[in-house]
From Swiss-Prot:
Keyword terms, alphabetized: ATP-binding, Cell inner membrane, Cell membrane, Cytoplasm, Membrane, Nucleotide-binding, Protein transport, Translocase, Translocation, Transport
Keyword Transport: yes
Predominant location category: membrane
Keyword Ligase set for record: no
GO molecular function terms listed in the Swiss-Prot or TrEMBL record: ATP binding; protein-exporting ATPase activity
EC id: 7.4.2.8
Membrane topology: Peripheral membrane protein
InterPro entries reported for this sequence: Helicase_ATP-bd, Helicase_C-like, P-loop_NTPase, SecA, SecA_CS, SecA_DEAD, SecA_motor_DEAD, SecA_preprotein_X-link_dom
Pfam families, per database record: P-loop_SecA (PF21090), SecA_DEAD (PF07517), SecA_PP_bind (PF01043), SecA_SW (PF07516)
Name used for this protein in its record: Protein translocase subunit SecA
Organism: Bdellovibrio bacteriovorus (strain ATCC 15356 / DSM 50701 / NCIMB 9529 / HD100)
């Protein structure tokens, strides 16, 4: 009550924010006549003028009103579009580094041009990030005309570009790109051996379109680049054979909500019997237990045509948020292989992580970050806590006319489909367009079959028909059109009442660059306008939701497709007690109420109580998912600090400045460690190991000390070691001559990359088992931090000792020139395009790292340190490492 009174008196937080921005909007509007009076050349000349002012010390905030006014005027002349006042507000919010929540149809793409133009004037590069290649190309092509007219360059980053092309695109003033490509380019850059090969510049400013999808939905799964590990796939087939013999609730239990499975005592015994094992929990059998759990999940939680499809003999993931196919992406941790075994397709080998980052940590690298979406306010707390981004709700240009009806709930899915069909027929009869949203491909196909049986003409938009996505969604607002779409397929394309004249013209003439296209558009426009008026008169676009999503935000996005720019519209959700969300939360309670009231199967419940119960369930799921993402960030923050340290170390080596100083620092650390290990300070002489010290010196530096001829004490031993090491260093330096620094550089990079890769394997294994610490009343996160810190200390020492050993022992072969030496030392780079890339809703791909070419330079260097090399660990070495890691724990 008090809150309501205060809100009436002072307005909401968003109202107060808008009032603060209004004076700036007034200043921009006051400049409009002045800008309109300029010639084209005078308006274009404003860009170099602004750039010069920024160089002289003005800030982007100082020139904001003028720059926005210039951009608005240029947009009128080039695009024929003028920014409304609410769009100026949106641009201001984005420039401030916040999230602008703008309703569907309010022109987010046009809004972005204001802060993009302003910040691109700095010359530091602006990234406009969106969810797929189609939107990247569409927006860059459309808005690139405006930026080009104003003298700025525009680039695009999409799948399939070469490194040279990517570098050129990132060098542009403005770059449109997808979130996945951005993240993978960052990881790939940090796997390269020459700074000139890096494609990205330092991260200055990013505007993330559909930021709720990218920064929230996709934040649960990290981006991973991986290569194949040496491991047999036979175990997947073996485990898959026993899964049908295990009975639910007898041998195992399944938790749909958390997607977990666990064996009962009877299940343990059954698996041991079927696999011929004496004890499933013996250390050597733990891997089999893990694969049994993954097999159970594959059979009972992952469904064909819902979570994945089979295409060309491969398992292809279906994105749970957009319903799109994700070719080339794989689930990790053996789950993808378990599904391959289940479906009888070829099982591809597991992968080893080579580089990884989460979107949470990637986007926090930007100096300034902002986002825009139609639905962000429900996740405002998360945006603030994780990204330090405020959400500002931007008012609509015209009042929203859409009517959102109460949910209706049926006992069965069949009864629900019948009711939906009846509603569709009634609306079609009066010419109202209908968009039906489904949660999965399976549901869209089932409803489509039901409508076909009833003779209802319709279009289906899901991952199976994604090629026609923009065309189908753009015409979903035509008179009497019925479109079934999975979830948020077609997001980013407005549904225009009466249809889209450009799309209709393109369908007629094909090429939108031809003169015939412009003529066709002019002919079609009057009929589109007439049809639009007709559709408005019958209520506008009608949205039918066939199931509530786990997130209220996704439901709001579906509703938001209707009622754009003040158009009329309506929405309603049809639910059944068989729906996933209803089944997991509150379904039994509502079913009891229906039975108590003796409600027939084909009669629905429409009550506020039901809607509230569903929204309560959604809030629980949202809270659970937020906890997962927060937990992921807490774990990844440990990895992020380590990644930054290693990438920083790597970059310092690549820059090549004071490379000798770096090597000498490492040399000092290695020698100190040797002395601390074998003759610890303050230790008794009886505890010293002079023999061990000599063995280490022989291995790392190729010399031994004759302790029999000297008075042995801490000072004399230390001096002898330092003297011997210095002598070896000078000898190496003299023998290598002018390119000793390049040799050091290559060896240091070799060691960093090889041991970082192995460290990632250790961390992966640590994550897998750390949750078990909870059974010992220990906090898994604290334990993880401790273990990861220890592992990183070991990594640091190992990198340095390995690199120093090679630098101090490397020898030239006679007549070997500088280039041959450097080529022999340069690590054999895997083709980065052939590695495996996994991203949210996905994981590792089943390509392989190419074998070394026969024409590649042969190694001509000799390492007296013995048979150490830079290959990945084999399976036996991994087992030993796992054993050592467990022993340390």
């Amino acid at each position: 009550m008090v809150t309501q009174i205060l809100t009436k008196m002072f307005g909401t937080k968003h109202d107060r924010e808008m009032k603060k921005i209004q004076p700036t909007v007034d200043r921009i509007n006051a400049l409009e006549p002045q800008m309109a009076a300029l010639t084209d050349d005078q308006l274009k000349a404003k860009t170099p003028e602004f750039q010069e002012r920024l160089k002289k010390g003005e800030t982007v905030h100082d020139i904001l009103p003028e720059a926005f006014a210039v951009c608005r005027e240029a947009s009128k002349r080039v695009l024929g579009m003028r920014h409304y006042d609410v769009q100026l507000i949106g641009g201001y919010v984005l420039n401030r580094g916040n999230i602008a929540e703008m309703r569907t149809g309010e022109g987010k793409t046009l809004v972005a041009t204001l802060p993009v133009y302003l910040n691109a004037l700095t010359g530091r590069g602006v990234h406009v990030v969106t969810v797929n290649d189609y939107l990247v190309r569409r927006d860059a092509e459309h808005m690139g005309r405006l930026y080009g007219w104003l003298g700025l360059t525009t680039g695009i980053i999409v799948h399939g570009l070469t490194d040279q092309q990517r570098k050129q695109m990132y060098a542009c003033d403005i770059t449109y790109c997808t979130n996945n490509e951005l993240g993978f380019d960052y990881l790939r850059d940090n796997m390269k051996f020459d700074l000139n090969d890096y494609v990205q510049r330092p991260h200055y400013y990013a505007i993330v379109d559909e930021c709720d999808s990218i920064l929230v939905d996709e934040a649960r799964t990290p981006l991973i680049i991986s290569g194949p590990a040496e491991s047999s796939t036979d175990k997947y087939y073996a485990v898959n054979q026993i899964i049908p013999h295990l009975k639910r609730d007898v041998h195992f239990t399944m938790e749909e909500k958390s997607k977990t499975a666990s064996l009962t005592d009877a299940g343990n015994a059954k698996v041991e019997e079927l696999m011929g094992l004496s004890n499933l929990y013996d250390p050597q059998n733990i891997e089999i237990l893990h694969h049994v759990y993954q097999g159970l999940k594959a059979h009972y939680l992952y469904r064909l045509d819902v979570e994945y499809m089979i295409k060309d003999g491969e398992i292809v993931i279906v994105d749970e948020f957009t319903g799109r196919l994700m070719p080339g992406r794989r689930w990790s941790d053996g789950l993808h292989q378990a599904i391959e075994a289940k479906e009888g397709v070829e099982v591809k080998s597991e992968n080893q992580t080579l580089a990884t980052i989460t979107f949470q940590n990637y986007f926090r690298m930007y100096e300034k970050l902002s986002g825009m979406t139609g639905t962000a306010d429900t996740e405002a707390v998360e945006f603030k806590k994780i990204y330090n981004l405020e959400v500002n709700v931007i008012p609509t240009n015209r009042p929203i006319q859409r009517k959102d009806q109460e949910d209706v709930v049926y006992k069965s899915e069949k009864a629900k489909f019948k009711a939906i069909t009846a509603d569709i027929k009634e609306r079609m009869a009066k010419g109202q367009p209908i968009l039906v949203g489904t949660e999965s491909i399976e549901k869209s196909e089932a409803l489509s079959a039901f409508l076909r049986k009833e003779g209802v003409k319709h279009e289906v938009l899901n991952a199976k028909h994604h090629e026609r996505e923009a065309e189908i969604i753009a015409q979903a607002g035509r008179k009497g059109a019925v479109t079934i779409a999975t979830n948020m397929a077609g997001r980013g394309t407005d549904i225009m009442l009466g249809g889209n004249a450009d799309m209709l013209a393109k369908a007629q003439v094909g090429n939108d660059d031809s003169p015939e296209f412009a003529e066709a558009v002019q002919k079609i426009k009057p009929q589109v306008e007439a049809e639009r008026a007709e559709v408005r008169s019958v209520g506008g676009l009608y949205i039918i939701g066939t199931e509530r999503h786990e997130s209220r935000r996704i439901d709001n996005q579906l509703r938001g497709r209707s009622g754009r720019q003040g158009d009329p519209g309506e929405s309603r959700f049809y639910l059944s007690l068989e729906d996933k969300l209803m089944r997991i939360f509150n379904g039994e309670r509502i079913q009891k109420i229906m039975e108590m009231l003796n409600i027939p199967e084909d009669e629905p419940i429409t009550a506020k109580m039901v809607t509230n119960a569903i929204e309560g369930a959604q809030r629980k799921v949202e809270g659970h998912n937020f906890d997962i993402r927060k937990n992921l960030m807490e774990y990844d923050s440990v990895m992020n600090a380590q990644r930054n340290a290693i990438y920083g170390m790597r970059r310092k080596v690549l820059e090549g400045q004071e490379i000798e100083r770096t090597t000498l620092d490492w040399l000092g650390d290695v020698v100190s460690n040797l002395l601390d290990t074998h003759i610890p300070e303050g230790g008794k002489k009886e505890e010293w190991s002079l023999e061990g010290l000599n063995n280490s010196l022989a291995q790392s530096f190729g010399f031994k000390i004759d302790f029999a001829t000297m008075a042995v004490n801490t000072e004399t031993v230390t001096d002898a070691v330092k003297s011997g090491v210095k002598e070896v260093w000078e000898r190496q330096k003299n023998s290598m001559g002018p390119f000793f620094e390049q040799v050091q550089k290559m060896i240091l990079l070799q060691s960093i990359d090889h041991h970082w890769k192995n460290h990632l394997y250790v961390i992966d294994k640590l994550k897998e088992g750390i949750s078990l610490r909870g059974y010992a009343q220990k906090d898994p996160l604290i334990e993880y931090k401790k273990e990861a810190f220890k592992a990183f200390e070991t990594l640091n020492n190992t990198i340095k000792s390995d690199a120093i050993e090679k630098v101090m022992r490397v020898q030239l072969v006679a007549q070997q020139n500088e280039q041959e030496v450097l080529e022999s030392l340069r690590p054999e780079e895997a083709d980065l395009d052939e590695l495996d890339y996994s991203s949210p809703s996905e994981a590792d791909i089943g390509h392989s790292i190419p074998e070394t070419s026969e024409d590649a330079p042969k190694r001509k260097m000799t390492f007296q340190s013995g048979p150490r090399d830079d290959r990945p660990m084999n399976r036996e070495e991994r087992r030993r490492m796992d054993k050592d890691t467990k022993g340390k724990r």
